[in-house]
């Protein structure tokens, strides 16, 4: 089993994501990211693995189904204290994901700003919601970060060894 910690990053709001991920790398995290986020990170010199590269499966439907793959979803939801689950992950070459950084498309803000409903609805983020739900379900073993305003707090907790 891979001893490196893994973070999954999929953000619509890319504000401060480069700085945040740089610190995650310094704290020993391997970054896995959706295509757009991965591009931003790698262009900034941060080593990141695309979800496509991890799963060996391209993002179908123009990226509408990015993360709903067992190699990602199972890695998030697995209990790292369960030898049985860790063994199953190892058998399938899946690694735990300890930190999930996801923020979703701002559907409500678009609607409030008067964006056409069909246009706004086409951007509803089902992937991000599923990832956040999986991480929340595994709250004892997975850190969930869904707001860039929380980056500093998470980094402080990492520095203090609280995570």
Set out the residue ranges of the language-model regions.
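General beta-strand structural signal in soluble alpha/beta enzymes
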Residues: 9, 30-35, 50-53, 78, ...
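Short glycine- and Lys/Arg-enriched binding-loop motifs that mark or flank ligand-binding interfaces
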Residues: 32, 71, 124
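Internal alpha/beta core interface subdomains
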Residues: 2-6, 18, 23-26, 94-163
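Short, exposed beta-strand "edge-strand" segments with a Pro/Gly-rich flavor and a Y/T-containing core
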Residues: 31, 44-49, 62-68, 139-146, ...
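Glycine-rich nucleotide/cofactor/substrate-binding loop typically near the N-terminus or early
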Residues: 36-106
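Sparse, context-dependent recognition of short Cys/His-centered cofactor- or disulfide-binding micro-motifs
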Residues: 33, 61, 85, 127-129, ...
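N-terminal glycine-/serine-/threonine-rich phosphate-binding loop
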Residues: 1-33, 37-54
């Amino acid at each position: 089993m891979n001893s490196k910690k893994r973070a999954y990053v999929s953000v619509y709001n890319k504000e401060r994501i480069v700085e945040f991920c740089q610190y995650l790398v310094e704290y020993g995290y391997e970054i896995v990211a959706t295509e757009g986020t991965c591009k931003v990170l790698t262009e900034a010199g941060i080593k990141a693995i695309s979800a496509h590269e991890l799963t060996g499966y391209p993002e179908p439907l123009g990226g509408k189904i990015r993360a709903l793959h067992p190699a990602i979803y199972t890695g998030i939801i697995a209990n790292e204290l369960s030898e049985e689950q860790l063994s199953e992950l190892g058998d399938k070459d899946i690694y735990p994901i300890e930190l999930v950084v996801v923020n979703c498309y701002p559907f409500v803000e678009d609607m409030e700003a008067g964006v056409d409903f069909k246009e706004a609805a086409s951007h509803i983020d089902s992937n991000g919601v599923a990832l956040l739900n999986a991480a929340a379900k595994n709250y004892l073993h997975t850190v969930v970060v869904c707001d860039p305003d929380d980056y500093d707090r998470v980094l402080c907790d990492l520095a203090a060894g609280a995570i």
